[in-house]
Amino acid sequence: YKRQLLADPDQTDVVVRHLWRSIPGEDPKATLISDPVLLALPRLRRLIAENGDREIERVQFDDGEEIAISRFPEQAVDEVVSNAFIHRDWRLPGPVVVEQTYRTLKVTSPGPLPPGVTVDKLLTTTSVPRNNRLMAAMRTLGLAEESSRGFDRMWATMIRTGRDVPEVFATESHVQVVLAAQQPDTTFIKGLRKLSERYGEAVIGSVATLIVLWHLNFAPLITVATAARKTQLTALEVEELMGVLVELGLLDSVADASEWTLSGEARKLLGRGQAGDLATVSIQEWIEAKLLDGESLRSADIADQTGVSVAEAGRILRHLRSLGRAQIDPEGPPRGRGTRWIRA
């Protein structure tokens, strides 16, 4: 392990393979790095920055401050690259492979996830290093921390810059993390600044809160099941988190259900308009969120909980059926007030 970290590898021992494509499908420009990890890491970061650290958007805040949004956030890149080296299985042959285009950054490292870690618990499980000596050495050199918080920072950095969270794929032979440049949501970025000023950075800066806010930036509500899946918390932890956010005035509870929406003030600060009744398009999203969570709905249920008419609820359900997103529950009545709809 010390050899990989500090010593020069053999001439044929490639530590990193960087593949750059300016156009999808073209033959990549390959750069092979055979340096020890201490030199390979900064060299790889520079290589990624040369191709991807280009400004794709600028955001000007109300106080006049202006910031540049790069194609791939520097902190997210640092975390994904460091994790690839720190947690790879050095007993397995093969380099860390970085595939980069103008739109995506894909980092693949040999070996499975560390013991005890699964893809659906990356944010909430402290990983156990495969080799304590290697981890201790990298920690001493500032390349790793005591607790595994790399994925937290990846998630938070992508959301803070108005992008979707990374995708992670894991098998017994490799772990792959994909960052997508996308078009940054500048309204959301500016809204986060306002929310931080209003509710405090400690609240808004939490990765779980950021995940909830990113979801509510596009959907009218979030259910306990969706929140648990996206934050990787337990249902009980989600209820506790949401309770705090409701007390602070950031979220509102929906009736007596385990569902939440942005408060009127938070909606305004986030740039999603004024408080008030949900628009029809939002009600459609609300229905889809319910169906995706495995619930069955009647037109009367929708009318009771959203304030639209039963007829309008029925129209939206039929529209979702035409889109292939909803269907009548085959185990219930095919028509009438008792008709229930489920996910298609």
Predicted regions and their residues:
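C-terminal regulatory or interaction extensions
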Residues: 2-344
